[in-house]
Amino acid sequence: DFVPGILIMVLFVFSDMLDGTMARMQNRTGVWGAFLDSSLDRVADGVIFGSVLICAVRTQSVGVQAAAFVCLVGGFLISYARARAESVGLDCKVGIAERTERLLILLLPAFIYGLGVPYVLPAALYVLAVLVLITVWQRFAHVYRQANA
């Protein structure tokens, strides 16, 4: 069922946010922990957005499928752009759709969709796909300006 699956995803996302906060509060952060946390975030994003893509392929129009695909790939590109920029000494903490926003914009409508409101998830995917593309553009433009300053 959709609703229990979404509730489990919300639980995992919340616990993921909590473990990073707890590590910072206890001054137990480190390079390995940061690397592992970022890597596991990508796995979680892949599972969440991949699941939505599979659902869209089974039940939605080609447009909704494309929006889900843009959200999946664009989400990875948003994260990669920041990591790559930081690896060459540039700042990249810009964009209107950071990970938390992307997850909220997806999971709440997915929950409502699971309760039987069919148009909510497709609408959220269309909005999120646009926000993801804007965020990718913002990050690329920001890094380009810094690199050519």
Regions of interest found by a model, annotated:
Residues D16, D37, G75:
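Conserved G/P- and acidic residue-centered "switch" motifs that form tight phosphate/ATP-binding loops
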Residues I6-V10, G20-A66:
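Basic, amphipathic juxtamembrane/active-site segments
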Residues D1-V3, V13, V47-A149:
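Hydrophobic alpha-helical transmembrane segments
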